[in-house]
Amino acid sequence: MNVMSKHALRFIVLSGSLAVTGAHADGDSARGKKLFEECAACHALERGANGVGPSLNGVFERKAGELADFRYSPAMKRSALPWNARTLDIFLADPQQEIKGNRMPFSGIPEARDRADLIEYLKAATK
């Protein structure tokens, strides 16, 4: 393979991977709503409606462990992780790895598309 062909092949591969990433970057809110059904076992979207997990109302406007009327693990409080699309994506991929010692009994969402869809739903549903 000549040098020009190698560069062309790299460009095609990179372009394809960027296109796939871009397709999931915004997420599908309707699909995210369906995915949230599993989260709803512990989390509510309404303000002050804490369950086993904290209410997610206003989650994009606060830091981890900051909701006054919920008892967080010391690890979650110490993290003070600012919640945004990027940090939620990382956390939801593997909660125990991202904040070691947190009490959330959930192994994570391995698929990037699923996380993007859930986050897109949460952006609108938690305002």
Where do the language-model regions lie?
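Bacterial N-terminal signal peptides that target proteins for export
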Residues: 2-12
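Sec/Tat signal peptide C-region and signal peptidase I cleavage site
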Residues: 21-25
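Short, exposed beta-strand-loop hairpins at the edges of beta-sheets
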Residues: 107-125
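Periplasmic/extracellular electron-transfer cofactor-ligation site
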Residues: 27-71, 77-82, 90-100, 124-127
